[in-house]
UniProtKB/Swiss-Prot annotation:
It comes from the Eukaryota. Its EC number is 3.2.1.4. Active towards carboxymethyl cellulose. The keyword Protease does not apply. Keywords: Carbohydrate metabolism, Cellulose degradation, Glycosidase, Hydrolase, Polysaccharide degradation. This is Endoglucanase 2. GO terms for molecular function: cellulase activity. It is an enzyme of class 3 (hydrolase).
Length: 31
């Protein structure tokens, strides 16, 4: 799955994710 800053495409968790799905930093964003 593709992960990006904001929300994970699969799961809906907020934060910054790397390509491997590792949380780099907790950044709750509003969408």
């Amino acid at each position: 799955n593709i992960y990006y800053a904001g929300v994970a495409e699969s799961g809906g968790e907020f934060g910054v994710y790397s390509g491997s799905g590792t949380v780099l930093x907790x950044l709750p964003l509003t969408f």
